[in-house]
Amino acid sequence: MMLITTHSLPLLLLLLQLWQPLQFQEAYYEDFYFPAYSDKEDFEDFMVEFQSTGPTRPPTKEKVKRRILVNPGMPLGDSGYCNYQIMRKNVYYKYSCVTEHYFLLMQYDELQKTCYNRFVPCKNGIRKCNMSKKLVEGVYCNLTKASNIPLCQYNSFYRRGYVLITCTWQNEMQKLIPYPINDLVEPPEHTKSFLNEDGVFVVPP
């Protein structure tokens, strides 16, 4: 691990580009986290995406696993969950904080299967989303402070519900990629409620 606090961010990024291919390990710039990468190609992809001024790159399986999926360990109900994971997984848009984000405790294959489930309304009521068939544990992150990295601050909300996603076709893999996450819908507390064909929870009389 290395701590650097005396250089500007652009200079640091340049230094890291020269240094990283020789030694892959974690590095910090104040509160900004540069993760370990297994090879030079992974690191270069991260740097290109971070510094790019053009359109956002299409989602990939690796990007979904890196930015959205989490493993058991840190309690999902921890109030600092989002601040830690957002920084650790580099969930940013260019140099800006994302306004909201979801972390899901599930395997990629299970999330990818959701792309083939029936359509339901998204939380904005406009686009079509696919909904998971099973309840999933996760964390909803809502930006509360700052707009540029590394000063992003988030509120963390534990949820257990149905995942709503939109999926993008990936030509190289010839598969649908489950990205982005639209919502994590908690079911009503009433145990007899169920989902109708429109994806709406219904409580029988």
Swiss-Prot record:
GO terms for molecular function: nucleic acid binding. Keywords: Disulfide bond, Glycoprotein, Secreted, Signal. Pfam families: RnaseA (PF00074). SMART domains: RNAse_Pc. InterPro entries: RNaseA, RNaseA-like_dom_sf, RNaseA_domain. One of its GO terms (biological process) is defense response to Gram-positive bacterium. Disulfide bonds join 97-152, 115-167, 122-129. Glycans are attached at residues 130, 142. It is found in: Secreted. Residues 1-24 form the signal peptide. One of its GO terms (cellular component) is extracellular region. Belongs to the pancreatic ribonuclease family. Does not exhibit any ribonuclease activity. This is Inactive ribonuclease-like protein 9. It comes from Cebus albifrons (White-fronted capuchin). The gene is RNASE9.
